[in-house]
């Protein structure tokens, strides 16, 4: 049966570890609340970072098993990846530019390199799970490159992307040195959604 694969930077739960024991804590974020019922239906799954760095392989295996009980698939990221891809490119480049505050942006090449490599990590996780007829539903600015990365490998995939923050005018967007790659990444989706008509324009 065809399934929906939801993909976001974070899973709708946070993985905790205490006394070498793993547990799950439900997220209170809007995305987790809004899509909470969807990923638990009909074999659907949710792919994302579990909110914690796990270095030991046995911990990763245990985490995968625990998350699988909730139809969740982790993408494990190192502290360095979180700092450069998420805190760096996502929050110090895309966030300020997309909110019309480009003077706060830090256009670091290293941030961009990590942003690309982490998007590729997410692609690899998806490719291990996608089957004919599945729909891939990607969420938000942390994964702008992902639609085309998937399309390059699986041309017939059904891909949707939704942007949960504003999308700037061209006059602002063109300030990003990697704007062409970002737009190309987004256009790998069959359907792109925005919050407002102004964002579409």
What kind of feature is each model-predicted range?
Residues 125-127, 176-192:
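Membrane-proximal helix-turn-helix segments that form the acceptor-binding/catalytic region
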Residues 140-143:
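Short His-centered aromatic/hydrophobic patch
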Residues 5-8, 136, 152-168, 190-194:
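Active-site proximal beta-strand in glycosyltransferases
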Residues 41-42, 133, 189:
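Short, well-ordered alpha-helix to beta-strand connector turns
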Residues 1-81, 159, 176, 198-201:
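N-terminal low-complexity, Ser/Thr- and acidic-residue-enriched intrinsically disordered segments
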Residues 38-40, 152-155, 183-187:
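Short, conserved loop/helix-junction motifs that constitute active-site signature segments
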Residues 91-92, 96-109, 113, 149, ...:
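Acceptor-binding helix/loop patch of EC 2.4 sugar-transfer enzymes
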Residues 81-135:
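Conserved nucleotide-sugar donor-binding subdomain of glycosyltransferases
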